[in-house]
Amino acid sequence: MMGPMSTREPTIEIDARRFWSTVMRSGQIGPGKAGGLRRLALTDADKEMRDLFVTWCTEAGCTITVDRVGNIFARRPGRDDHLPPVLMGSHLDTQVAGGKYDGIVGVLAGLEVLRTLDARRVATKRPLELVCWTNEEGARFTPPMVASGAFASVFDVDWVLALRDDDGKVFGSELERIGYDGKTAVGGRGIDAYFELHIEQGPILDREAVPVGIVVGGYATRGMHVDVHGETAHAGPTPMDRRRNALVGAAMLAVAVNEVGWNYHATEGKATVARMVAWPNKAGILSEYAQLTCDVRHAEREVADRMWAEVKAAMPECARRANVEMRIAGEWQFGSERFDPGCIRLIREAAEQLKVPHRDILSQAGHDAYYISRIAPTAMIFTPCRDGISHNEAEHAELDYTVPGVNVLLHSVLSRANR
């Protein structure tokens, strides 16, 4: 390999056609019903995409390792291979009715960086690693971002491996079934820095026609599963005052959560119930059990904490009115982190060097970068998506508005890896 190219050299750029053809190829694996993707974690479609990703990375000169929760690491050696690596990454799994770009663009942007360096025979002082995090979406195994969370010691590895989907299938068993039950330890190793490129999943960059968002941090997010316990009974003869319908209790709490969101709407607060299940969930019978998943989000951590307290305060009254029992089955929080100033500076310098219009921005969605920021200097780059639509098969991104961000990623990583 040649020596490291100066990161001030403006001529090195990615191969835009190669990058976009890779994104389009990914968009053929796990097709949805309306033009998007349904590629849930650890399904056959996920395996097909993972296998192709590994092939691409190997062809770019990388060595592959897989850890116990299925995270894939593609390593490109550095001139001093004993130094901690600079990481890039995101995820390849999607929502049930997801788009072709969420997470995927970030992983394949990292791949294009590796391909570009390989084609140009550019060596870096530090090794580079591209990571595909498992089950970022949490669409099949909840909560989201469990594998990056395990890597950052937020979640216990054995707890992650024991998670079950709605059909009772076990995370660890599904990893084994698709051949990605790796043997490498999860986390516990040195990282110089982590960079993640991602579509914004909001309307700001698209509305302002700005191709690069420099993510300085994220909305504080608080989430939980709530179990509701009642009693089965006949829907006909059972008097209203004797009913213990778990589904009604869950529905009351769902309305209360939504009201908290509206109460903070003026300051861009959000409260959501995104999932609800009930058993037996049949006509003519009251539900004995229900579970809902909810969260609150706000740019200010103190306000998010206040919103969360209001949600929890609503639980006893909802339980009393429905004559049921409620308990919190699990909680999580993320997003109140602020990203590393040094990594942010490198992104800003790269954007200015390449004359790419950019602006600072906060992330309002959850990302693997949040958990990695707890153990390593981290920053994110946002690129636009049309009308801010995401977690929807209509999600769309344009080549011309995505490539500038990938070039900024390339130069940011080069700068960091050559320190």
Per-region residue spans from a language model:
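Acidic, glycine-rich active-site loops and adjacent beta-strand->loop/helix elements
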Residues: 92-94, 128-139, 201, 232, ...
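His/Asp/Glu-rich mid-to-C-terminal helical/loop segments that flank catalytic regions of hydrolases
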Residues: 216, 234, 238-263, 308-313, ...
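Midchain, well-structured core segments that form catalytic/ion-binding scaffolds
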Residues: 135-136, 140-302
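Flexible, glycine/charged-enriched surface loops at secondary-structure junctions
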Residues: 65-67, 123-127, 182-187, 237, ...
